[in-house]
């Protein structure tokens, strides 16, 4: 011990001070898909599989079901880490929905969408961008939303089975989770399995594009108004006018449905989540900013748990968090943020019991959703007409 008698020199390492905080990885996909002819060794049923090369994985994904075309749509945008859970395609839509919703087997194995919860322990990655392209019925989307809340992830879901704007907006009303974005309609692209154009879930493209934006721009940028690679058309007509809200796109966006437009390339149009009215996380990036900050700050301070609770430890915690906020502000990920120690939440009985509360706030970066130019006609530029001629 340091207090024992010793006639000589001791060196004691002091590992204190603030520590750098690394932002959690966000461009990790969690894909639920069907493919009865997929390689069962590469994609076993109800088992999370880590795909590090989506293009190479397509060779073992089969051609039936949704897996192959979903991977193709993702690969057209970028090549992210993707956790794939293959579920059995039932003889009916209801059976497929049951398989995708999943649950827990008698021996404790997580099934369907629930298998994404096992990705962290089995694969060492946490899916942050979730979707079940082509099989995301209302029940599946609700199951995915529940998983997303536990993973601090975000779900992209189609307005399943909706053929009209009215139906799509009504469908959106079935959800109230900030972790969900509803998309309508779907894309059309070339299907190499049948040598002709066919519809494909826009959700697969949204997942790939979300990962691409995270990698190239950041999680503070919404999905909206970025060119999508691959689509050749839309499954439904969508009337869009940049300057007129009285359009199909305007109605959909007003009801928090992200739609698809073609303006210099196919794009998603809309940044709203399904959060219930009155909430704070109505923009996609507001939700994702909250998720990223929560996990980043919590995981960065795992090493602080069970250390001696000295005032110096609190100072180190605060400096670590505030240094991270300064860095995120400098890079444009947040407007600003600040952490502090509040005595009212840290009375002596709580401190004595080993409890510490650190407060912090932050301001996410709002997307420019509604740009207004105020155009005026004037005759003041005629006042010096003669001088302008002389010039």
Regions found by a protein language model. Name each.
Residues 1-391:
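Surface-exposed assembly/interface segments
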């Amino acid at each position: 011990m340091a207090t024992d008698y010793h006639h000589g020199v001791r060196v004691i390492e002091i590992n204190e001070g603030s520590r750098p905080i690394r932002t959690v990885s966000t461009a990790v996909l969690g894909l639920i898909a069907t493919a009865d002819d997929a390689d069962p060794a590469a994609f076993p049923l109800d088992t999370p599989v880590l795909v590090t090369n989506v293009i190479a994985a397509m060779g073992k994904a089969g051609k039936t079901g949704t897996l192959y075309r979903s991977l193709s749509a993702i690969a057209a945008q970028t090549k992210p880490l993707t956790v794939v859970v293959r579920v059995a395609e039932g003889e009916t839509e209801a059976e497929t929905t049951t398989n995708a919703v999943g649950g827990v087997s008698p021996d404790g194995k997580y099934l369907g969408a629930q298998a994404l919860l096992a990705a962290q322990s089995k694969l060492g990655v946490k899916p942050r961008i979730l979707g079940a392209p082509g099989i995301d019925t209302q029940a599946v989307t609700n199951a995915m939303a529940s998983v997303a809340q536990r993973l601090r992830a975000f779900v992209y879901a189609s307005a399943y089975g909706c053929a009209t704007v009215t139906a799509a907006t009504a469908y959106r009303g079935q959800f109230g989770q900030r972790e969900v974005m509803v998309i309508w309609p779907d894309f059309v692209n070339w299907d190499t399995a049948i040598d002709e154009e066919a519809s494909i879930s826009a959700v697969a493209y949204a997942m790939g594009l979300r990962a691409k934006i995270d990698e190239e721009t950041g999680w503070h940028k919404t999905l909206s108004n970025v060119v999508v690679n691959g689509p050749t058309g839309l499954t439904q007509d969508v009337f869009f006018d940049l300057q007129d809200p009285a359009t199909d796109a305007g109605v959909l966006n007003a009801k928090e449905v992200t739609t698809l437009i073609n303006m210099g390339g196919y794009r998603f149009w809309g940044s709203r989540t399904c959060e219930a009215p009155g909430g704070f996380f109505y923009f996609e990036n507001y939700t994702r900013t909250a998720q990223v900050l929560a996990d980043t700050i919590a995981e960065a301070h795992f090493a602080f748990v069970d250390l001696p609770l000295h005032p110096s430890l609190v100072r180190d915690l605060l400096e670590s968090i505030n240094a991270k906020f300064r860095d995120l502000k400098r890079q444009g990920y947040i407007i600003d943020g600040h952490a502090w120690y509040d005595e009212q939440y840290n009375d002596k009985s709580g401190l004595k019991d080993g409890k510490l509360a650190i407060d912090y706030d932050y301001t996410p970066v709002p997307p420019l959703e509604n740009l207004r130019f105020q155009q005026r006609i004037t005759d003041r530029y005629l006042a010096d007409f003669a001088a302008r001629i002389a010039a």
